[in-house]
């Protein structure tokens, strides 16, 4: 069931051996970017947010698994690889939470590109 007028959530954080790169949608068309130990609050355009949601639908992000890798590895992992977390909820209440360690869903890089377009960030 979808609930109308839910608080939108766009949150991504990814890190390896360096401090995390994080983007987050705040209230009143504001966004937060944390990268290279810098903290910026920016103004976002409504049309860019709507375009982002269109791309999320096109990419099939709502169908991504909750965890990557989907299967638990047989060997214990070293913790020096890339770890990421994504939280989304559109204005209709459709939500997705997923995370991963050194494993990524299909179209992950395109989704990162769309986050960079929305926030003006440089997540790699």
Walk through the language-model features, giving the residues of each.
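Short, thiol/selenol-centered motifs that function as redox-active sites or metal-ligating centers
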Residues: 15-21
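Short, flexible N-terminal segments of the mature chain
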Residues: 21-40
